[in-house]
Amino acid sequence: MTFLRLIFLACFWTSTAGVAAPQVAVDVGHTLAAPGATSARGRSEFTFNRDFAGELVAALRTAGIDVRAINFAGDAGSLAERPAQARGSDFFVSVHHDSINQEFLEFWDWDGEEMSYTTLKRGFGIFVSRRNPDLAGSLRCASAMGAMLRRAGFVPTPWHGRKHQPADADNGVWYYDNL
């Protein structure tokens, strides 16, 4: 997690240089009522998202950045509610983990329970909406994050190219306008 914190902080400082008292809104994807897929070891997407978002919030606050935490309790009423709660923030990050379609899953026993997993889809993707108010800044940040992930040995997945136009495919950045 430390490396990912550094990636975000480097990108954030680059994109907000010269701005006084920035505020970052950090949103936890999914909810307790709709927790998303379950991992190969029984953890929900919401749990992964909340854990990572908690690490990110801690790193930002340690760096002296004001943070607006969104949906950490898992009770967000709707998707539209989240950006509304972030309104006025300088930067909005929504943390998600991606699942895969049922037909690509294999099964195994984990602690006496049958769980699913995949070996097909690996890697990362970073999504940017063309409808956001600072597309150029968001693309610079996303590309910088992807480049840092690649230098650390992570691999961007081409999987998202099936449904999304590339913004910077080499660095795992894709357009997704329905964020």
How should each PLM-predicted stretch be described?
Residues 1-179:
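Catalytic-site microenvironment of enzymes
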